């Protein structure tokens, strides 16, 4: 096992990465190794997808499957080894079908890629794990060095984050052939184990640019189906009655659950990254969507254990449900998996609803505590002139985007301390689950404009980018000249691709933490600092002083 893709990876003087019987996320060595094997199979599939496009062949089954299966290897998504192998087998079957399509056009068609003809050696998980050793990401570290390995992983993990957003967009009916062609090209190239530093740096920027387009179609999918988010108050306390908790990012799953629970007497609560759903008109119209429960994903083993109903996980992040003994009432959807946990194959939430009706639910309603969400792209753009006016009258000094992933490290208190230290004449724009570090605190307003503005999920970084570009255009300056600073927390691969997106758009002087990715070498960090001004957090006082004086 070797895995260094998330922020909580093991770090020692000898090197970074989880390489024991189990990773810090709870992923076993078996599952981790089989995920490496799956990725190799997906690289072979993408190699043939690239070849097929040369013949004008676009196989939508391949396009739909490839990012979804890649998403299953993202941190805290799928811990179920047999299902990972199932994805690998499906990848190979689709590859062979695609190969046959190519051969039907050109009998001499061939694909010059090391992964293009990969076959699984056995049905036995142990033998497959031994085969997977051929594809361990750091297998040639001694030959290529840490810097090349780090850049490879930056590209691989960044592309994995983009694949997750591609799947979210696909679920909402969004498809862009150019995006999929670019995805397959990059995925296939990474399967050649590239070792050119400049080419890898260029690839990382290409992934970032591609992801901007992915976030654009995801935004279109969400707003077309569910309307544009508008500011909405959400109760974060319990309401009396039977209940279901839904976590993750998939708004379609939430919509289906709300439709199926309507009139049943079962209330629905959002958790984690599902919180922004309350801002969408077509979701909040369901009166039994009563509130948001819990805090950051890392606290779920305590909070889920206390929740008096079933829980549905639609995407990341799931952690071991046996710790809180709620594994008999947690359900996984789509690419999510945990051994022994009930999995919903389709869109029928009937079994979950039936379980909710058999459980006690909340015995009484707590005193409401309301927070505000729903500052989506349209709302943000509608406030652009107000922001400019406040800046021109020196009522608004600075905007801080403080957001990103949450996690368990104590150092993440930095982001709470930073938010609460932001001066009263400054605004905090937030997104993703890092907001749970401070989103239930009171920040007041500036002439009626809330000082804490929740823009949505991690992918809603797109809205923040569009706002920044709009402000820069109206003020006749560059984005980097705005009174705007980005203070980002990272944990997994979606955060990595958001960072690449920002860097590829030329955004500079981003501050990130609580620690640098384990695959960032000192040399790589130095390059990113020199080129983009990217740096790690220090202390709240020092960072605040530096950002306000920039």
Swiss-Prot record:
Cofactor binding note of this UniProt entry: Binds 1 [2Fe-2S] cluster.
Major subcellular location class: cytoplasm
Domain of life: Bacteria
Keyword Iron-sulfur: yes
Origin organism lineage: Bacteria, Pseudomonadati, Pseudomonadota, Gammaproteobacteria, Enterobacterales
Catalysed reactions listed for this entry: A + NH4(+) + H2O = hydroxylamine + AH2 + H(+)
Residues that bind hybrid [4Fe-2O-2S] cluster: 249, 273, 317, 405, 433, 458, 492, 494
Cofactor annotation: [2Fe-2S] cluster; hybrid [4Fe-2O-2S] cluster
Keyword Signal: no
Organism whose genome encodes this protein: Salmonella enteritidis PT4 (strain P125109)
GO cellular component: cytoplasm
Protein name in UniProt: Hydroxylamine reductase
